[in-house]
């Protein structure tokens, strides 16, 4: 058992080093000297009896223990800020502009109505909501919060899991009456596949897993689009096999308008809130992330529900 608990200010120093990339830059952000930052990290490492950071000529890197500490520190500092907001009973309300990005399909069907409800609760906020058909750079595209259906999040961003999701193979009964249902991934190459140019997917390559292994399958067909809504309509019309998010096709599976193809296979496509600034620094960012998490979990299920595909 530890002789003492890590101090919140030391956890904050660690977070600032990770985000700024150096001890000196973290010191400038905190309004302290580099010597102060070095001292606080030494105290934190002594308290936890482990090395958190490796320093070299190329910069600073987290150790395995440091990565764990950093992830917990983000949660703890956010909880601290929430405690301060609640206990002091300050009537501060989140206000000002926040820029939110998302893909077209999920943005229209889920995030847009969520933002409408968000504004009812926090009318002092100003929201600019932008839809993209490509993977974006938060800095270059001037986005504060991006909602991504993709597990490959760059290390220089912070990601909060909103809910689990997977993409599944589907086709209309009409199509499967004309063509024999594929019995293996390899047989997909013989079918008309409706290819969607997703933000995170290589065009014409479907990566699918069954919980034990993951395979990349090259597919093609007569129809393709960068609009998931159009591809869904084509599938309903019996034009081919598509790979779509479960949230998008569930009503049609339940009604029988679509059926699963190779149901043992799926593609992991969890839904994340992605941002650069730690939540404890920004009330408006924290409020938006927490609201969207609650919204998605209420409608799509909590993060611990369902299964994780490879």
UniProtKB/Swiss-Prot annotation:
InterPro entries the UniProt entry points to: LysR_subst-bd, Tscrpt_reg_HTH_LysR, WH-like_DNA-bd_sf, WH_DNA-bd_sf
Any one Gene Ontology molecular-function term assigned to this protein's record: DNA-binding transcription factor activity
GO biological process: DNA-templated transcription
HTH lysR-type domain boundaries: 6-63
Any one Pfam family match given in the protein's UniProt record, by short name: HTH_1
Keywords recorded for this protein, A-Z: Activator, DNA-binding, Transcription, Transcription regulation
CDD domains: PBP2_CrgA_like_9
DNA-binding region as annotated in the record: 23-42
Membrane-traversing stretches: none
UniProt keyword DNA-binding present: yes
General function of this protein: Positive regulator required for L-tartrate-dependent anaerobic growth on glycerol. Induces expression of the ttdA-ttdB-ygjE operon.
Entry similarity comment: Belongs to the LysR transcriptional regulatory family.
Name of the featured protein: HTH-type transcriptional activator TtdR
């Amino acid at each position: 058992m530890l002789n003492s608990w890590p101090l919140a200010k030391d956890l904050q120093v660690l977070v600032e080093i990770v985000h700024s990339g150096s001890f000196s830059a973290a010191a400038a952000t905190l309004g302290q000297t580099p010597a102060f930052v070095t001292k606080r990290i030494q105290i934190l490492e002594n308290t936890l009896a482990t090395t958190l950071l490796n320093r070299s000529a190329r910069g600073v890197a987290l150790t395995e223990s440091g990565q764990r500490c950093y992830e917990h520190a983000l949660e703890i500092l956010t909880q601290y800020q929430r405690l301060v907001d609640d206990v002091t009973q300050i009537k501060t309300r989140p206000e000002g502009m926040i820029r939110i990005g998302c893909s077209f399909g999920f943005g229209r069907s889920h995030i847009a109505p969520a933002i409408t409800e968000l504004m009812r609760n926090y009318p002092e906020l100003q929201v600019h909501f932008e839809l993209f058909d490509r993977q974006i750079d938060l800095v270059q595209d001037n986005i504060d919060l991006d909602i991504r259906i993709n597990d490959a999040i760059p290390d220089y961003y912070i990601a909060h899991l909103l809910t689990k999701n997977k993409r599944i193979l589907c086709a209309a009964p009409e199509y499967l009456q004309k063509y024999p249902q594929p019995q293996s991934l390899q047989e997909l190459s013989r079918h008309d596949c409706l290819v969607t140019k997703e933000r995170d997917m290589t065009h014409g390559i479907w990566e699918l897993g069954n919980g034990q292994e993951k395979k990349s399958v090259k597919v093609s067909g007569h129809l393709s689009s960068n609009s998931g809504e159009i591809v869904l309509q084509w599938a309903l019309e019996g034009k081919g096999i598509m790979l779509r998010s479960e949230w998008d096709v569930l009503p049609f599976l339940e009604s029988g308008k679509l059926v699963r193809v190779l149901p043992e296979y799926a593609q992991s496509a969890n839904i994340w809130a992605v941002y650069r600034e730690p939540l404890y620094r920004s009330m408006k960012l924290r409020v938006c992330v927490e609201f969207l998490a609650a919204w998605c979990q209420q409608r799509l299920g909590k993060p611990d529900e369902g299964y994780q595909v490879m």
